[in-house]
């Protein structure tokens, strides 16, 4: 049966960019990956076809050969001997780790070996996982021990992560002799590609584990305990080493990253380790002075003395009443900002008393307003002159 055009297989035009090729491949590979379509022979064949097409087109040199010679550039009477200098067919295999490698790596500022990396013997490090957790400001203040349910893969208990059935073990790939790569020559072209037999692992499994189907891992939801230290801020990232996705065929597990989001509070605002609270006070208290009770995030009430003549916006600093600093004995401060409340719903008598107060008042009782209106008068006088 004749092979389909590689560009048609990936659903892209012949002038598609490398990024467009990768995007198309990843999208289709996720759809047809054997792990997602177990027992579906058509999906398995489609997946192999996708790998072969992308493997040929992702490299500039092999893509140029394909554009010039078509499929003959790769199967023009060439055998399948592996290893450097040998000749072999082309094709590649992609695990789900390969497909999702970029997706899980990007959230930490780049790939940087964060998963999907193959080691000796075909071992592949598991992906790092991300878990978003929302906590209250009180929980950030006190710290807490939380339970998180993490979906993902864990090492297969039957084969202990090797992928091979009990009593057997992986063997050196006969095609590439354990190199994971094969070379093919066509005229002046010599192109090294991933081994089509072991998919770059250097090993094959004759007797796959029936529990994990040779993957070395199975899907399972886990419940983990996470210690959240007191003083964490919004956006804090907590790393749980080795609690990410299980590796392939005995490879190391990835890490789990807990990203914390602190919910807004109804009374307090936060700036680093400092807390801010706006407290309304009565006009009489602001005028004559007095004592008010203010809340703290720890649940205790603190008394604050308000001096005579206090104005809206006046701040009072309560040292050590703010947020704790993570991994430190230091503590931030609590700032109380008062707002003078104008009385409403006055009785007739209250209004009469205020009118008497107004009549008895002098400009010195309201220096800011008196000074402001004096400046306004000077401003207007300047226009008249």
Swiss-Prot record:
Major location category of this protein: cytoplasm
Gene (UniProt): dnaJ
GO biological process: chaperone cofactor-dependent protein refolding; DNA replication; protein refolding; response to heat
InterPro entries: DnaJ, DnaJ_C, DnaJ_domain, DnaJ_domain_CS, HSP40/DnaJ_pept-bd, HSP_DnaJ_Cys-rich_dom, HSP_DnaJ_Cys-rich_dom_sf, J_dom_sf
CXXCXGXG motif repeat start-end pairs: 156-163, 173-180, 195-202, 209-216
Family under the similarity heading: Belongs to the DnaJ family.
Protein's name according to its UniProt entry: Chaperone protein DnaJ
Keywords: Chaperone, Cytoplasm, DNA replication, Metal-binding, Repeat, Stress response, Zinc, Zinc-finger
Binding site for Zn(2+) 1: 156, 159, 209, 212
Quaternary data: Homodimer.
Compartment(s) of residence: Cytoplasm
One cellular component (GO) term of this entry: cytoplasm
Record domain J: where: 5-70
């Amino acid at each position: 049966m004749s092979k389909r055009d590689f560009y048609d297989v990936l659903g892209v035009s012949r002038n598609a960019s490398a990024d467009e090729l990768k995007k198309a491949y990843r999208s289709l590979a996720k759809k047809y990956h054997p792990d997602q379509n177990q027992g579906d022979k058509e999906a398995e064949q489609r997946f192999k076809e996708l790998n072969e097409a992308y493997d040929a087109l992702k490299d500039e040199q092999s893509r140029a050969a394909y554009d010039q010679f078509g499929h003959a550039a790769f199967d023009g009477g060439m055998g399948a001997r592996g290893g450097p200098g040998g000749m072999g067919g082309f094709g590649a295999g992609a695990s789900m780790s390969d497909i999702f490698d970029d997706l899980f790596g990007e959230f930490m500022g780049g790939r940087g070996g964060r998963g999907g990396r193959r080691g000796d013997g075909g071992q592949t490090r598991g992906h790092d996982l991300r878990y978003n957790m929302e906590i209250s400001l009180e929980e950030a203040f006190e710290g807490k021990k939380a339970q998180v349910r993490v979906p993902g893969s864990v090492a297969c208990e039957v084969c202990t992560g090797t992928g091979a059935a009990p009593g057997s073990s992986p063997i050196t790939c006969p095609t590439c002799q354990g190199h994971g790569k094969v070379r093919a020559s066509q005229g002046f072209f010599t192109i090294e590609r991933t081994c089509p037999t072991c998919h770059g692992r250097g090993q094959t499994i004759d007797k796959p584990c029936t529990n994990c189907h040779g993957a070395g891992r199975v899907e399972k939801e886990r419940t983990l305990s996470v210690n959240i230290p007191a003083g964490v801020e919004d956006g804090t990232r907590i790393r749980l080493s080795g609690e990410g996705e299980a590796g392939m065929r005995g490879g190391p597990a990835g890490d789990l990253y807990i990203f914390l989001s602190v919910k807004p509070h109804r009374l307090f605002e936060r700036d680093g380790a400092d807390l801010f609270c706006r407290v309304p006070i009565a006009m009489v208290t602001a005028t004559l002075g007095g004592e008010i009770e203010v809340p703290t995030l720890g649940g205790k009430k603190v008394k604050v003395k308000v001096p005579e003549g206090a104005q809206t916006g006046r701040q009072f600093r309560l040292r050590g009443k703010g947020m704790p600093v993570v991994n430190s004995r230091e503590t931030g401060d609590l700032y109380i900002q008062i707002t003078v409340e104008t009385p409403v719903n006055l009785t007739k008598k209250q209004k009469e008393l205020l009118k008497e107060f107004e009549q008895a008042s002098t400009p010195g009782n309201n220096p800011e307003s008196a000074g402001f209106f004096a400046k306004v008068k000077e401003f207007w006088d300047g226009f008249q002159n």
